Amino acid sequence: MNLVNRQLVRVITATLASLATLSTMAANAIEEPAYTVARAWESEQIEIRRYAPRVMAVTTMQGSDGDGFRVLAGYIFGGNATEQKIAMTAPVQQSMAGEAEMAFMMPAEYALKDLPTPDDERVGFKEAPAYTAAVIQFSGWASANRADEHWQRLRQFLIAEQIDIAGQPTLNQYNPPWTLPFLRRNEIIVPIALSEAILSGSAGGR
C-alpha cells in the first residue's frame, strides 16, 4: 500500500470513529422508555421486559415511512396550539401488522393533559399502560424484509419457549438516519402474557 492510500485509510478510519462517537453521544442524550428486564437470553439477543406506562403521539401512515415521521416531527418541533417544542425521544415505533401506524413516545414529564393540541389533525395520542413484552435486537438497516426476518425468529423462539403472544409486533428504531449501519439499534417488540414459569425459567426448554 503506497503512502497516499495509507493516508486515505487513516482519514476514513478517523472519520468513521468520529461519526461513531457522535452517534453514541446523540443516542445517550435521548430519553428512552423506562423498563426492567425480567429475563434474558443473551446469545439470542432476546429479552423479556416490563415497561412502565407512557404517552404516545401517533399517526396513521398514508404513504411512506417518512411521511409519518414528518407528521409527528412537525408536532414536536412546534406544530401545536402553543408552538411548544417537545424533546425528541427514542425509539420511533412502527406497527408491523394491521393499520400502518407510527408513534413517538412523549417525554416522561408529560401527562396526556399536559400536551398541547396538534395543528395537524393527523396527530393523535395514546396512553400505553404498563405491560410485559418480548424483544429481539438487531443492528443494520431495518428494512421490511429484515424486520420480518427478526420477527419470525422471535415468534418461533416464543413458541418454543411456550410463551403466549398477547398482541401485535412493532418495529422500534433508536437512531438518527446518519448513524452508521453497524451502530444502529433496532428492536422487534411484542406483548406477551407473563407467568411465573417464564420468570423462573421453567417454561419451554432453554
Annotated model-derived regions:
Residues N2-R206:
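A solvent-exposed interaction/effector surface
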